[in-house]
Amino acid sequence: MASCVTGTEAAIRAAACRDGEEASHLKIVAVFAIFLTSVFGVWGPVLLAKYFHGKPLYDKAILVIKCFAAGVILSTSLVHVLPEAFESLADCQVSSRHPWKDFPFAGLVTMIGAITALLVDLTASEHMGHGGGGGGDGGMEYMPVGKAVGGLEMKEGKCGADLEIQENSEEEIVKMKQRLVSQVLEIGIIFHSVIIGVTMGMSQNKCTIRPLIAALSFHQIFEGLGLGGCIAQAGFKAGTVVYMCLMFAVTTPLGIVLGMVIFAATGYDDQNPNALIMEGLLGSFSSGILIYMALVDLIALDFFHNKMLTTCGESGSRLKKLCFVALVLGSASMSLLALWA
């Protein structure tokens, strides 16, 4: 629980850091720096897919990048977004009021975010099942290992064209799933990117903004790698790829500009209880979405259902270890940024 007592030394330090003119200059720098690093991060995997698709080790490289990105997204939700949401709702100006002091709303809204992401997943999966042309089972049957050849079930009377149709159907379902993952992931990222941008845009604290520029630039690179890796595998049309990458790149900078406009128009106080409540609730909701996406649609899907990682033998074992190391490095690198942002 946040303390309601403000020390004299802390108050003096806060007053010295509050410089609207310098803060505005820093925020303009932040807009361009974060935009450029976002473009670099999200377009990296997409360009890799465009120019190296079909080359040796391409699929493995994309998988390793995706596992690194899953670690980044998991750390973003648990180390960055969720603690800030709890902190906002635990502030003494909020936690001293009803109903905020009576119930842990941050945890509740995080759970709602995760369940909402699950609902979207289930709805889309049901839609794919009915529209996949594979009957009521959606074309995704359980296949005993002894009856599977090359990832396809060998049934009596099925050969040649039948197997090719089944393979194409399964590939299309996988692509649709990857597209859904990319879209829901971007929604979760956009939620908390807007919060980050608007919060920075409204802040007049130069001591807070200065280190945030560097930290958020790295943050956007890592998060962009995560989203870009998913987009690269999803097989979107060129226009959709450009749109999704552009949306990711401009969301935080536009949030900063919006925050500056709100402050200029209203003199908005970022310590206002209503602002803290809104930040806490939106942060909790986006955290729930990101936790679900990282654990279920990225980590579990790749480590337990990807053919390259479930293949028996030394090659599959080495790749699995490499992907696990990438996951840990992604989590650690993003967690380290919590020291500054």
Curated annotation (Swiss-Prot):
<feature type="transmembrane region" description="Helical">
    <location>
        <begin position="28"/>
        <end position="48"/>
    </location>
</feature>
<feature type="transmembrane region" description="Helical">
    <location>
        <begin position="244"/>
        <end position="264"/>
    </location>
</feature>
<dbReference type="Pfam" id="PF02535">
    <property type="entry name" value="Zip"/>
</dbReference>
<dbReference type="GO" id="GO:0009535">
    <property type="term" value="C:chloroplast thylakoid membrane"/>
</dbReference>
<feature type="topological domain" description="Lumenal">
    <location>
        <begin position="201"/>
        <end position="211"/>
    </location>
</feature>
<keyword id="KW-0864">Zinc transport</keyword>
<feature type="topological domain" description="Cytoplasmic">
    <location>
        <begin position="302"/>
        <end position="320"/>
    </location>
</feature>
<keyword id="KW-0472">Membrane</keyword>
<keyword id="KW-0934">Plastid</keyword>
<feature type="transmembrane region" description="Helical">
    <location>
        <begin position="180"/>
        <end position="200"/>
    </location>
</feature>
<dbReference type="GO" id="GO:0009624">
    <property type="term" value="P:response to nematode"/>
</dbReference>
<feature type="topological domain" description="Lumenal">
    <location>
        <begin position="83"/>
        <end position="102"/>
    </location>
</feature>
<keyword id="KW-0812">Transmembrane</keyword>
<feature type="transmembrane region" description="Helical">
    <location>
        <begin position="62"/>
        <end position="82"/>
    </location>
</feature>
<dbReference type="GO" id="GO:0005385">
    <property type="term" value="F:zinc ion transmembrane transporter activity"/>
</dbReference>
<feature type="transmembrane region" description="Helical">
    <location>
        <begin position="321"/>
        <end position="341"/>
    </location>
</feature>
<feature type="transmembrane region" description="Helical">
    <location>
        <begin position="281"/>
        <end position="301"/>
    </location>
</feature>
<comment type="similarity">
    <text>Belongs to the ZIP transporter (TC 2.A.5) family.</text>
</comment>
<protein>
    <recommendedName>
        <fullName>Zinc transporter 6, chloroplastic</fullName>
    </recommendedName>
</protein>
<keyword id="KW-0809">Transit peptide</keyword>
<feature type="transmembrane region" description="Helical">
    <location>
        <begin position="103"/>
        <end position="123"/>
    </location>
</feature>
<keyword id="KW-0793">Thylakoid</keyword>
<keyword id="KW-1133">Transmembrane helix</keyword>
<keyword id="KW-0406">Ion transport</keyword>
<keyword id="KW-0862">Zinc</keyword>
<dbReference type="InterPro" id="IPR004698">
    <property type="entry name" value="Zn/Fe_permease_fun/pln"/>
</dbReference>
<feature type="topological domain" description="Cytoplasmic">
    <location>
        <begin position="49"/>
        <end position="61"/>
    </location>
</feature>
<comment type="function">
    <text>May play a role in the transport of zinc in the plastids.</text>
</comment>
<feature type="topological domain" description="Cytoplasmic">
    <location>
        <begin position="233"/>
        <end position="243"/>
    </location>
</feature>
<feature type="transmembrane region" description="Helical">
    <location>
        <begin position="212"/>
        <end position="232"/>
    </location>
</feature>
<feature type="topological domain" description="Cytoplasmic">
    <location>
        <begin position="124"/>
        <end position="179"/>
    </location>
</feature>
<keyword id="KW-0150">Chloroplast</keyword>
<keyword id="KW-0813">Transport</keyword>
<feature type="topological domain" description="Lumenal">
    <location>
        <begin position="265"/>
        <end position="280"/>
    </location>
</feature>
<dbReference type="InterPro" id="IPR003689">
    <property type="entry name" value="ZIP"/>
</dbReference>
